Regions:
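Active-site beta->alpha loop and helix N-cap motifs at the rims of alpha/beta catalytic domains
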Residues: 1-93, 99
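Catalytic alpha/beta core domains of metabolic enzymes, predominantly
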Residues: 74-76, 87-124
Length: 124
């Protein structure tokens, strides 16, 4: 597992190698919103195209707490944001109501849904 500083170094190296030839989306998910915000701000500073985050994988949070976590990240930068739903690893499956709420934010540009089985995505 990488530290926040190591993750910053990796993100910077990827962006430098990608230049403007590729879209760079930096995953900023951490157990704490504070560290996620730190990574999101760094992603913005290196010129990343977007940020993405899962809910906390350690703490099993209710939807309103996940919403606060994601909104804290979103509000910390001008980067577009991609919700990452991977319930088999996080213990949190994005409820449709929260998805609808989050989708109203113009910075939310998409969702990476790794839910299994994949046909469950039809609900979104």
């Amino acid at each position: 597992m990488l530290s926040v500083e190591e993750r910053k170094q990796v993100a910077a190296a990827v962006k430098e190698a990608a230049g403007d030839d590729f879209t760079v989306i930096v995953h900023v998910g951490c157990a704490s919103t504070k560290e996620s915000i730190e990574l999101a701000k760094h992603a913005e500073s290196i010129g990343a195209d977007a940020a993405s985050a899962v809910p906390s994988v350690y703490y099993h949070l209710p939807p309103q707490s996940v919403e606060m976590h994601w909104n804290g990240i979103i509000d910390s930068t001008n980067l577009p944001f991609i919700i990452y739903n991977i319930p088999q690893l996080t213990g949190f499956n994005l409820p449709y109501d929260l998805f609808k709420k989050m989708a109203k934010n113009p910075k939310v540009i998409g969702i990476k849904n790794s839910e299994e089985p994949v046909y469950n995505m039809e609900r979104y």
